Amino acid sequence: MVILETKEWARVTFGECKLGDQRRTKRLIRLAEQAAARPDGSTPDQTESWGDCKAAYRLFDQDDVTFDEIVRPHCEQTRASCRPGDVKLIINDTTEVDFGCSRRATGLGPTGKGSGRGFFLHSALMLDAADAQRKKCG
């Protein structure tokens, strides 16, 4: 398993996005770094300045900046990690981690019917169907 630092992860994950202008790709990488550093925050909380926040909203408002284009490089990296003809199993689970209603901690949000505080954890494990060996996802 390869664990990347936040800046390297953002560059590897989003550096190949084609958003109509290289400056947009650089902005997306910066925004991804900021979001990874504060995943529990809103866009204004995650960005380092009001200018960064406005730039993020301008980026999202561009016609060339689409969900499909943002995830395209990640999907290509995942496909490239598999040889043609290989069968992979991707086992995933979403778990609700609830700390109860009295727990006060940063980064927690409403869970259940809104009375609890916690977060959702979504994990995925890719296995080779032939030998059940764990594989790198993406």
Question: Can you say where each PLM-predicted feature lies in the sequence?
Answer:
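Conserved, well-structured functional cores that handle cations and Mg-NTP chemistry
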Residues: 1-138
